[in-house]
Amino acid sequence: LCPCRQQAAILEDLVTNVPLEFDFLFSKSHAEVISGKQEGVYAWIGINFVLGRFEHKDEEDAVVTVALGDQAEALVRKRTVGILDMGGASLQIAYEVPSSGTFSSPQQEEAAKSLLAEFNLGCDVQHTGHIYRVYVNTFLGFGGNFARQRYEELIVNQTYAHNSLQGQRTGLSAETPFLDPCLPVGLEDTVVRGGQTLHVRGRGDWQSCVELLQPLLMAPNNTQASLAGAYKAPIDFTNSEFYGFSEFFYCTEDVLRLGGRYDAPSFTTAAQEYCGQSWAVLMRRFHGGLYSAHADQHRLKYQCFKSAWMYQVLHQGFHFPLDYPSLRTAQLVYDREVQWTLGAILYKTRFLPLRDLRPESVRQAHGSWLRLSFVYNHYLFFACIVVVALAIVLYLLRLRRIHRRQLRSAQLDMLWLDKVVLLPPSTGPGP
């Protein structure tokens, strides 16, 4: 989304200014613009690391059989989790592909190569027990906010075209609004796109909204991927598990309070009930504190649309079955937020000799302590001198006291010897 020239300027600014503000080594190789594929791989590594999916399997753990490269025997190990992440601008999916599979055409095989990442998380390149093949795809323009913009362009263009053909004035004034199925009942709004203004009023028909969003699964333009037509590595829905983050969690939790294990029928019922409520009722509920503390009026306004969009993406775009039981929507994992940066650290340091680094880190820490103590902390330096000088003085005083005690003891011994009387030897009586 950021032009290459701006990317280069940001990196140059970092390389120039970070060393001025901080004292650690920072070179040009320490900053880079990563691709969506790299970010997806790092995010996948991070969440699976936190969940312990790279550890050796226990008896109760779900497992998967993995066939990699030229290995004669398939490997059985812990099943990893896939991730779904919908932001405001983009949509991302990443999951392990246990087997290479087959391709219907050379074009599909070529597309698959650009979307599959194979990497080793073992302690060295010979350790093949932790080689993973992960499918990663990022769809720009398919995030919740961008999808709404594309939807507004769609209804503006369609309504103006319909008016031109039928000689009508739908949406040209507040008295004859376009009835938007993706807004709550009675909510009035104005949409401006390409110099054209469309007056809309919500009619809260969630099912119609879902159907109206179907064309948006295609690519927004020729330079971006199409969710409907993009290559997707096969998913074994009978032996897989996914976590949905960001908009997947907000759509299910902030208003509907259904975060956690995703159940399509329950979600559909709750979404339809919400969309069918009048805007006035929703505002009363909002001011009454019935929704999540994270919910605001923007969330209430677009919840109907975003829930329909999430549903379309999940079930029509990625073809998740309606009875799929293993999707969880979440914001935190084990009470902490998992970022892709954790996966980046794990990936970058996977081959480092940690046992050799530990003594080195101790030496570096010791050297850093000396530098801080004797160069930057003058007070501590002078305090050490005072303590040493005081210790020397106390030691000399103690030696002096011991010397005096020994001298006094010697004088007493001499005085005692002077007072000793030498007696002649005794003689017995004569015969």
Protein language model annotation of sequence segments:
Residues C2-V81, L91-P431:
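Helical "lid/coupling" subdomains associated with nucleotide-phosphate turnover
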Residues G88:
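Flexible, low-complexity interdomain linkers flanking nucleic-acid-processing modules
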Residues I83-D85:
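Short hydrophobic beta-strand that contains or immediately precedes a catalytic carboxylate
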